[in-house]
């Protein structure tokens, strides 16, 4: 199997406390790895360095195989409280068709002429299949009101939207920090099934 990730000599400290120092490892294509350690030992910091959110204290290198897509699910994913669920999903997926966002906004506006133009744009692009895929993933995660604002969601609902965004990226490498926090057992079982079936490479932190 090809090496998807090479990590060399990364370190992280907070004040006088060293979380980890000069650690190196490889993760190969198809690996599914769970990192289990006590709280406060640097698990989340490690994942954030790998995802490019934080930096190693003393240099080192994090190198992913060229051209693979990497998706990161943070333990507490920030979101825009004014976004609808759909707008939040779209804002995290730069490769989606803009026609789809315009269509959803046209439907909400009740403007028939705007809707007519939006439908034509959807027909001319891949908008319908993208919309169907988004709705299917959100429904599987029990999120059905795409017009609901993110600020109105519970912690568990917001986490499910973040998971949907991750799934819709179709990334080859997933980095997940405590993915089951705030989730009901049926959603946890759905996520476990998805990860088992997926051919993605996985590194996650869990209890």
Regions found by a protein language model. Name each.
Residues 1-207:
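ABC ATP-binding cassette signature C-motif
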């Amino acid at each position: 199997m090809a090496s998807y990730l090479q990590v060399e000599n990364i370190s992280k400290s907070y004040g006088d406390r060293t979380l980890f120092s000069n650690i190196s490892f490889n993760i190969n294509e198809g690996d599914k790895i769970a990192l289990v350690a006590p709280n406060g030992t640097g698990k989340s910091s490690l994942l954030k360095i790998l995802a490019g959110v934080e930096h190693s204290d003393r240099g080192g290198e994090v190198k992913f195989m060229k051209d693979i897509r990497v998706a990161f699910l943070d333990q507490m994913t920030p979101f825009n409280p004014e976004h609808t669920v759909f707008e939040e999903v779209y804002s995290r997926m730069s490769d989606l068709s803009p026609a789809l966002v315009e269509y959803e906004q046209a439907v909400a506006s009740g403007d028939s002429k705007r809707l007519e133009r939006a439908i034509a744009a959807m027909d001319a692009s891949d908008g319908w299949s993208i919309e169907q895929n988004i709705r299917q993933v959100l429904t599987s995660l029990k999120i059905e009101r795409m017009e609901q604002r993110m600020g109105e969601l519970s912690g568990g609902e917001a986490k499910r939207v973040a998971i949907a965004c991750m799934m819709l990226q179709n990334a080859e490498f997933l980095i997940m920090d405590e993915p089951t926090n705030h989730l009901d057992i049926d959603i946890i079982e759905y996520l476990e099934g998805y990860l088992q079936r997926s051919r993605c490479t996985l590194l996650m932190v869990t209890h």
